[in-house]
Curated annotation (Swiss-Prot):
Transmembrane segments: none annotated. One of its GO terms (biological process) is cytoplasmic translation. It comes from Saccharolobus solfataricus (strain ATCC 35092 / DSM 1617 / JCM 11322 / P2). This protein binds to the 23S rRNA, and is important in its secondary structure. It is located near the subunit interface in the base of the L7/L12 stalk, and near the tRNA binding site of the peptidyltransferase center. It comes from the Archaea. It holds the Pfam family Ribosomal_L6. InterPro entries: Ribosomal_uL6-like, Ribosomal_uL6-like_a/b-dom_sf, Ribosomal_uL6_a/b-dom, Ribosomal_uL6_arc, Ribosomal_uL6_CS2. The lineage of its organism: Archaea, Thermoproteota, Thermoprotei, Sulfolobales, Sulfolobaceae. Belongs to the universal ribosomal protein uL6 family. This is Large ribosomal subunit protein uL6. Keywords: Ribonucleoprotein, Ribosomal protein, RNA-binding, rRNA-binding. Part of the 50S ribosomal subunit. GO terms for cellular component: cytosolic large ribosomal subunit.
Length: 181
């Protein structure tokens, strides 16, 4: 069943500045800035009305409705990110060979994972801050997608293949995700 008019209004907090050019939304806040392009969403109009972001579409079928509410969620995540920020925690786990992790430029270098001589590298995306504290890695930033992808890059760079995972539990694993308060 198609819905004739679908409209959603998202409240903009006082300490957030929203800039809209076509389908590109730039949101600035105390924690940083997030830019996202929604040009893929055909038939969905995004506009500013005072201190609200207004999204509208007409004759929304099931697929268009799914895209519409995905965009609403993305914009809400962007506003939360620039006002509070996102943080992921990862744990370095090793049994015999002490794994060392350090941040060099825009990459995380993992050395001595299960005694390997080569260095594994994971890319840090733009706008994301990574810190290593003992056996914990903290990934934080205003863009949820960039923070989550950086944490996933670190986790997948430390993935071990060719070993029984029940015995060789070495690696780096995400154990906590949170919104910074």
């Amino acid at each position: 069943m198609q819905i004739v008019i679908l409209r959603e209004e998202i409240e903009i907090p006082k300490n957030v500045v929203v800039d809209l050019k076509g389908s590109i939304i730039k949101i600035k806040g105390p924690k940083g800035e997030v830019v996202k392009d929604f040009s893929f969403a055909k038939g969905i109009q995004i506009s500013l009305d005072g201190n609200k972001i207004v999204l509208e579409t007409t004759f929304a079928n099931r697929r268009k409705k799914a895209v519409f509410y995905s965009i609403v969620s993305h914009i809400k995540n962007m506003i939360t990110g620039v006002t509070k920020g996102y943080r992921y925690y990862l744990k370095i786990i090793y049994t015999h060979f002490p794994t060392s992790v350090k941040v060099v430029g825009n990459e995380v270098q993992i050395t001595n994972l299960i005694g390997e001589k080569n260095t594994r590298r994971a890319q840090i995306l733009e706008g994301v801050k990574v810190t290593v504290k003992g056996e914990d890695i903290v990934v934080e930033g205003p863009n949820l997608e960039a923070v989550a992808q950086t944490a996933a890059n670190i986790e997948s760079a430390s993935k071990i293949s060719g070993f029984d995972r029940r015995i060789f539990s070495d690696g780096i694993f995400i154990y906590k995700k949170e919104v910074i308060e």
